[in-house]
Amino acid sequence: MPSSPITVGLVFGGRSGEHDVSIRSAATVVRGLRSGENTERYTVQPIYIDRDGRWWGTDLAEATLTSEVAPELTTPRPPSGFQGFPEGCDAIDLWYPVLHGPNGEDGTIQGLFQLTGKPFVGAGVLGSAVSMDKQAMKSAFSSAGLSQVPYVALHASELEDAKSRSALLDRIERELNYPCFVKPANLGSSVGISKVRSRQELEAGLEQAAALDPRLVVEQGVNAREVECAVLGRRTLEASVIGEVRFDADWYDYETKYTAGRSTTLIPAPLPDPVRDRIREQALQACAAVGVHGMSRVDFFYDETNDQLWINEINTLPGFTAQSMFPMLWAASGVTLEQLVHKLIQTAGE
């Protein structure tokens, strides 16, 4: 145990659509850092980023963590965006980002932390950026030989005129069958995703996604179980037990993910041991393919009728809310919340 506590700069909130989820995740992480032996190991210095990108120091950050909702900000306010670190940040020994979506898990803030010369929890710039962009991620998975559902990658510019739009719709319908899913390439938590069953719905879904991100992906829908594996470590990666998500909805959208009672998690997932082993092995392969270390949650589709396993995506800053798989998977693997956040900080220093 260190002679003096390590000061952890816990950064949360952010400009993405997952702002509220980040607050709830951060509150859980802080509980872990302020419990048991961690109270002697760490001093937590929270930093809140508001929806306009302003960085706020300890007083507002602590109040936000206590309420677990975004605060009402006073006026006049400082200019929006990053204007420098809040007072007292020079004492921070290590950064712990609890940020979801753009500017949080896409390599942006990881680059800022790297410039400070201090270690930080989670994946680095490259792994974060590749994992956040679904087009880049899918290319990396393909190069690693990992099976994926059929998909079409495209750019919003292909929707700009009637001729190219029609050609795009024709190409998607030629390569994929309905239903399919239209996704912005760089958003998380199912934000901006739509399930489409016709050409009219496809066109509307593309318009909706293109308003959020110029890079888009359309994926073939499959009738499969949704299973997940958590990964932890830096020099040596460990894979958790496997979990399964079952939900009371047509698909696993944002509301279903974050509304209590709308989804059910089965941990461990009721799967044959050989299938569990394949999932764990492919989760580690996925991390290697995109250059991810620290922590991640890797999501798969499994069709038990033909024993087909497809990798879906990797999340480099998975949620830590009450409904979040990552901490629950590790708890089922024998790692408590207190131990988990400690391990994550240890990996940052390796």
Curated annotation (Swiss-Prot):
Residue ranges occupied by any ATP-grasp domain in the UniProt entry: 138-346
Keyword Metal-binding: yes
Class of enzymatic activity (EC top level): ligase
Subcellular location: Cytoplasm
GO molecular function annotations of the record: ATP binding; D-alanine-D-alanine ligase activity; metal ion binding
Residues annotated as signal peptide: none
Pathway membership, UniProt: Cell wall biogenesis; peptidoglycan biosynthesis
The protein's required cofactors: Mg(2+); Mn(2+)
Keyword Transcription regulation assigned: no
Name of one Pfam family that matches: Dala_Dala_lig_C
PROSITE patterns referenced in this protein's UniProt entry, alphabetically: ATP_GRASP (PS50975), DALA_DALA_LIGASE_1 (PS00843), DALA_DALA_LIGASE_2 (PS00844)
Protein family according to the UniProt entry: Belongs to the D-alanine--D-alanine ligase family.
Protein name: D-alanine--D-alanine ligase
